[in-house]
Amino acid sequence: KVDELKDKEAYKKEWNIDGWQASLDRMTPEQREAWIASYKPRNEKFINENLKGEDLVKWKYQRYIKDYVRCIKSIDDEVGRLIAYLEKEGLMDNTVIVYTSDQGFYMGEHGWFDKRFMYEESFRTPLIIRYPAKIKAGSECTALVQNIDYAPTYLDIAGIEKPDYMVGTSLVPLFGGETPKDWREYLYYHYYDYPAIHMVRRHDGVRDSRYKLIHFYGEKNEHNDAISCNELYDLQSDPNELNNLYDNPEYADIQTRLQARLDKFRVDQKVDEY
């Protein structure tokens, strides 16, 4: 737990060596020993090579992608162990399996590693559900869902009424393959943790089944100009979000519609900065 760290303030500012050391304090002695055994030789090799320019960029990418793939392999192995146990105990048909994450990830797309931006690579979240009694194997759903829908879904499956204070909508109505007519048509996103270690500018936005509007905002930059810029994408014709259509006359109606919806989200969610 963060509250149990020796240096909580350093951990919150982990872009420096003190913060890095504080993050190691989260590990048990056994975990720390395993971490050092794995990374110390590679780190020392990196320091001794004193890489520059393109060689440094390639090294960073290889380090990142290998750790990323190893993480996927580890998760796959552990999920496999869980499924093997359920099969052994005869519990597979009496268990709902949900495979998901808190976001997607960038591996160089948009010149970025990590997450946080509203572009599709991190905005789209993995979600696989196995529920033989309700969901046909291999079926797909294109409805707009959010992670705030998970808890109401679990309660619904268990036959428990959702508390009034809980946001989100049960996904159970989607299990049959049809999307209810009153299902949500838009998603709202807001990132506001700036300045911070990742230095991602504040932005919010709205997405429907095809289009996305993003608004970047914030304090003055090095040119003494207040940051305020917008991006509009057609995700059907431009899935990689490389062609900004904002202020394109051909998309004026779409831009106006999305802006109106974004403004409504800001009011409904009591957003006080944008």
Give the predicted meaning of each segment.
Residues K1-V145, I157-Y165, E222-I227, P249-D253:
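Active-site-proximal cap/lid insertion segments
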Residues Q103-E109, I148-A151, D156-E231, L235, ...:
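C-terminal cap/loop subdomain of S1 sulfatases and analogous C-terminal strand-loop tails that border
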Residues F175, Y246-P249:
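A general structural motif at alpha-helix termini
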Residues D238:
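Intrinsically disordered, low-complexity polar regions and short flexible loop motifs
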Residues E241-L245:
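Carboxylate-dense, calcium-coordinating segments in secreted/extracellular and ER-lumen proteins
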